[in-house]
Amino acid sequence: MAINYLNSRKRLYVVDGYAGWDPEDRVRIRVITTRAYHALFMHNMLVRPTPKELEGDFEGGADYYIFNAGEIPANKNIPGVVGREAISLNLQQRKMVILGSQYAGEMKKGVFTIMNYLMPKKGHLPLHSSCNVGANGDVALFFGLSGTGKIALIAVG
């Protein structure tokens, strides 16, 4: 449904980027959307590949795909769908589909979920946090949900 809808659009935005900075652990993400602001949101959120990385790492595709067709409602005839919104992530197929929601944060939450699934398998503890490093090398961690001021705290630190 989402792919058919996206294929019917005259203009699509495709954003390739990495989730994570470490070259050994980062995940290649490809976002396909019809909304410019969704593309800009993910362009700012993901680590931008260099032209060389884009040509090499993404030429064969990405590790995970996000198909954002938020303009169209979900089909309530599909088992498990109970409303007009459906945000589905299949970790085996490595695909996320967004239907019926214009909220750009759905994509971010999907990437968080992917990383929260993958990183413990590599021995890493994923955290939704930010930090400040003091003059003596001491570190303060700030934990919180989206929009609770973690970035604001480090900006004034």
What are these regions (language model features)?
Residues 133-157:
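Glycine-rich phosphate-binding P-loop
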Residues 1-139:
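A noncatalytic interaction/capping subdomain that flanks phosphate/NTP-handling catalytic cores
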